[in-house]
């Protein structure tokens, strides 16, 4: 899942460094998330559904696949985008030369939340990489992380992302009956990578790291190592030994060549 400017490839960008991926022996595929669900709030979408290809009256095309009336627990845009990632994988399974048993799903920010959910719901993804995914992604809700976003902020700023029932936890992050390490643990025993940035206070880097740590017992159940902390928690000291990887990059809220390089290092180690 990528931004439009990165899909058209009119200029090189670290956000989607295709040249470096190819140089290292990896294929690259991307889809535009807003082709599946618009990334903005609109009363019609809130009441009737989020997955659209066409403009009103929404009577045919892709929209015809979805219920006309949303319930409190109907899925939001994050789930639609994750569903889209699985449809990309469907196609990759038909492409000669692509080993569909070794496909990673990678996302940044809201895309990181999407990647986690795609990995949790589709076990065909061999590696799940969530970059700067923050609240409702890889950041724990039950731990206070200074300046990090909250459930209320996510629901108020992006009410189309999740089901409406989730709003009952606005201002109640600490009483949510589960936490994000449960979501991360659903990837086990496959490969998981959580990435943070030191200057990305909103995503709560420490809370993201704790999710990697506290999800790891799920890998132990399979007789495998989760996060192996073979060094100090500090900037640009990646943890790659276990099947849960982590790094803290210097800088702000972005997906950079450093992040991609560490993802590929991890894949080289565990998927080659």
Please name every model-derived segment:
Residues 157, 213-272:
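C-terminal catalytic histidine-bearing segment of alpha/beta-hydrolase fold enzymes
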Residues 1-94, 137-143:
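Cap/lid segment of the alpha/beta-hydrolase catalytic domain
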Residues 188-205, 249-252:
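Conserved strand-to-loop "acid loop" that flanks and positions the catalytic carboxylate
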Residues 97-109:
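Alpha/beta-hydrolase fold nucleophile elbow
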Residues 85, 112-123, 128:
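Short glycine-enriched nucleophile-adjacent loop
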Residues 23-29, 99-102, 123-127, 188-192, ...:
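Loop/turn elements at helix/coil->beta-strand transitions in domains of secreted/extracellular proteins
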Residues 77, 109-112:
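Active-site loop->helix "elbow" adjoining a glycine-rich segment at hydrolase catalytic centers
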Residues 87, 94, 130-183, 204, ...:
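Mobile cap/lid helix-loop segments that gate and shape the active-site cleft of serine hydrolases
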